[in-house]
């Protein structure tokens, strides 16, 4: 093999190895950042994995919000109108968080079936509902509650 052909072959191999490594790293990073959405029914039925970060969403049950008096710990119940799941969170809830509205919590399920959230997302206006929550509500035969009109 002449030197020019050998040099070209090495360059092509180096490029292919570099592209392969880049694709592998990108896939690894994407796999670690995927958070699958689970409804309260799926979580209650044991379909959601424990010790894996997931997204859990539904409607916050009225009267279920409990705040700790001496810390930022919050506990509330989320439902899809079939089954409910308890969510615990340590931190400041979003300003738009209210009972009776749709939320999505990101966290892990503990051995007791409670979602220990590290992030809670609330809808940003009364017309928005996360697509996953809307789908889960439709599957359960419910519709999203209509907000009370102000004034």
Curated annotation (Swiss-Prot):
Listed Gene3D superfamilies: Nucleic acid-binding proteins (2.40.50.140)
Cellular compartments annotated: Cell inner membrane
Cytoplasmic domain ranges by topology: 1-8
GO molecular function term, any single one: heme binding
Superkingdom in the source lineage: Bacteria
Membrane topology classification: Single-pass type II membrane protein
GO terms for biological process, alphabetical: cytochrome complex assembly
Positions of heme binding: 124, 128
Keywords from the UniProt entry: Cell inner membrane, Cell membrane, Cytochrome c-type biogenesis, Heme, Iron, Membrane, Metal-binding, Signal-anchor, Transmembrane, Transmembrane helix
Similarity-based family: Belongs to the CcmE/CycJ family.
Family matches, as NCBIfam families: PRK13254.1-1, PRK13254.1-3, PRK13254.1-5
Name recorded for this polypeptide: Cytochrome c-type biogenesis protein CcmE
Organism for this UniProt entry: Pseudomonas fluorescens biotype C
Protein's gene: ccmE
């Amino acid at each position: 093999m002449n030197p020019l052909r050998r040099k070209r072959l090495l360059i092509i191999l180096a490029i292919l190895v570099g592209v392969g490594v880049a694709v592998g790293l990108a896939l690894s990073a994407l796999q670690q950042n995927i958070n699958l959405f689970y409804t309260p029914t799926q979580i209650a039925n044991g379909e959601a994995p424990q010790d894996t970060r997931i997204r859990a969403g539904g409607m916050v049950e009225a009267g279920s919000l409990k705040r700790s008096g001496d810390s930022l710990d919050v506990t509330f119940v989320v439902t899809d109108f079939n089954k409910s799941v308890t969510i615990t969170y340590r931190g400041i809830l979003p300003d738009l968080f209210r009972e009776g509205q749709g939320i999505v919590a990101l966290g892990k399920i503990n051995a007791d079936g409670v979602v220990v959230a590290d992030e809670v997302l609330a809808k940003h206006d009364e017309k928005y509902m996360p697509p996953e929550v809307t789908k889960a509500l439709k599957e359960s035969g419910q519709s999203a509650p209509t907000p009370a009109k102000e004034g």
